[in-house]
Amino acid sequence: MRLGKHVSIAGGLYKATDRATKIGCNALQIFVKNPRGWKIKEVSDSEIKKLKDNIKKENMYPLVVHSSYLINMATPRDELWEKSVNSLKKEYKRTELINADYFVVHPGSHTGKGLHFGINRIIEAINSVFGEVKNGPQLLLENVAGAGSSIGSNFTELRDIINKVDDYARIGVCLDTCHAFAAGYDLRYEDGLEELLNDFDKIIGLDLLKVIHLNDSKYGLASNKDEHAHIGEGEIGEKGISNIINHPLLKDKPFILETPKFSGRDKDVELVNLLRRD
């Protein structure tokens, strides 16, 4: 089982691997910059080499990069859209530089301008990134909880973006379990999970599902609220999480936890390993 967690890069990118292995992970997710700002600091060749060496030494896979928080590919505000695209390009270049496997991005919000407008704006943004960075890793669109005018809470919206991206080989999906539950898929039960997988396969295709963000949900079914809970302590619960990680179509996918931090041992990592049936 490939199980990782989103970990801090404080003190250097390469220190993320130490944090991941310390809590029992063999995969990881990071930001490549401060996620709450536009600036991106330079990183030295030695820092990048240390990260690559650590990844190889610990046999960690995949290395997933998550885009920063301020990016909105769907915004009608030209200045924000330009900033978003420029930041995406810089982060995507760094993702390529460190040999990361995937780059996860939230589609964004059209803020009232309309779904059609927002989707076209997202397509334009991704094509601009791919046009400048020719050999980067797969960019994964993440499903969202469905609050407000956000795009990507249903698979049809994600498909409409994917089908019009110029470089189809470089696009995929990251499925967030908390977001799917918040958007209406009842992952507490096997029937709800089967419904999700059937819809995903019919609309997008399971071959494009590359990474799963394994998160419990603080809020109830179809709440459209995005707040992650510790595994087994949220509304999806242990049984629901167990169904997900042991499903024949999902068990070989990489799982990344984005649950709240623990001060010591990571009980989420431990519980997921206990729930896994080999």
Curated annotation (Swiss-Prot):
User: Which SMART domains does the protein's record reference?
Assistant: AP2Ec
According to UniProt, the reaction catalysed is: Endonucleolytic cleavage to 5'-phosphooligonucleotide end-products
What single Pfam family name could you report for this chain, choosing any that match? Answer: AP_endonuc_2
Which residues of this UniProt protein bind Zn(2+) 1?
66, 106, 142
Q: List the disulfide bonds.
A: none
A single Gene Ontology MF term assigned here is: zinc ion binding
Domain of life, source organism? Bacteria
Instruction: Please list the residues that bind Zn(2+) 2.
Output: 142, 176, 213, 258
Q: Which cofactor does it need?
A: Zn(2+)
Coiled-coil segments on the chain, per record: none
The free-text note explaining how the cofactor binds reads: Binds 3 Zn(2+) ions.
Question: What keywords is this UniProt entry annotated with?
Answer: DNA damage, DNA repair, Endonuclease, Hydrolase, Metal-binding, Nuclease, Zinc
GO biological-process terms attached to the record: base-excision repair
Give its E.C. classification number.
3.1.21.2
Q: Which PANTHER family match?
A: APURINIC-APYRIMIDINIC ENDONUCLEASE, ENDONUCLEASE IV ENDODEOXYRIBONUCLEASE IV
- What is this protein's record name? Probable endonuclease 4
Q: Which organism is it from?
A: Halothermothrix orenii (strain H 168 / OCM 544 / DSM 9562)
